[in-house]
């Protein structure tokens, strides 16, 4: 059994007193290699693994029951948040894996994205890798996503920049990577990204 994220804790209000921002203190962060776990988090859920298996089956990379893995992924995702799947949802258009292969991939990616909403980097990578949900790319006006130091001019960030300490501690490899991948800016398209 995994430990629940602090965001899922029933004590969240008492921990943060209704505020979701605080200055870094030992209650929020640990110095490197000091102390124990403070806020354990989920790295990958059972839902995510079932959605990825369903995707692999639809793409022909694996064999099995894509619809079954999709349904199991939905169940795990909803159970994680304490929500039961109703018969109405289970039989709905979004609750079943039907349609063309592209429509199936869109449904799977969208559900993976929803299931990862507390894991922003993973959700961002899902959109970058699959192009779904398309609305995440075309309708977001969140300045944290869109402006990113003003260099994006309203576009969706294609990649994250290397941290400045990497240039001092690993300059040769960073320069080689930039030569292969393109400029170290958020607008540089990544080889693996669909969008």
Model-derived features: positions:
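Acidic/polar-rich alpha-helix caps and helix-coil junctions
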Residues: 4-195
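Active-site loops and adjacent core secondary-structure elements that bind or stabilize anionic groups
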Residues: 1
